[in-house]
Amino acid sequence: MESNAFSRIAEENMQGLYRLSFSILHTRHDAQDAVQQGLLRAWERRETARPEQIRAWLTRIVINECHNIQRKRMRVVLMGEMPEMAAPEDTYEAEAELRSAIDSLPEKLRVPLLLRYMERYSETEIAQTLGVPVTTVKNRLFRARCAVRAKFDEEVTFE
């Protein structure tokens, strides 16, 4: 892949990658680090990328970087230090409750939900990104929606 094409694709996906990273890591600094490190790794391996799956490939790399950062955090916590936590930015109560409900989901349910409804990935793209069958993605999305709905007295509409 040419450097101009890679730069364009990275630029087009950067905000979505950041939002996903932030939803996993909950701090701006770590989310920025994950995206930057992920794009650097992608740049180094850009020749191996298949153009038809570039978005899923980039997303998977950044998710892996988020996991690396989480592992580093765990080591810090085990050594007795507490990681810096971001203060909630949402000022509206409903948004804060929704974010809390989504954040409380296990990662295997939270990531597909965020990719589907925040980043507008198709179920097929999510399956490619996560390396699971489409039926698994559908099941996880269903379970995630049910879990979020259970946090509220009234039904939440995602679409």
What label would you give each PLM region?
Residues 112-116:
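A short pre-motif secondary-structure segment
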Residues 29, 124, 135:
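Residues within helix-turn-helix
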Residues 63, 130-154:
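DNA-recognition helix of helix-turn-helix
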Residues 19, 33-40, 44, 52-64:
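Structural recognition of an alpha-helix C-terminal capping motif at a helix-to-coil junction
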Residues 60-80, 91, 143:
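Arg/Lys-rich amphipathic alpha helix in sigma70-family domain 2
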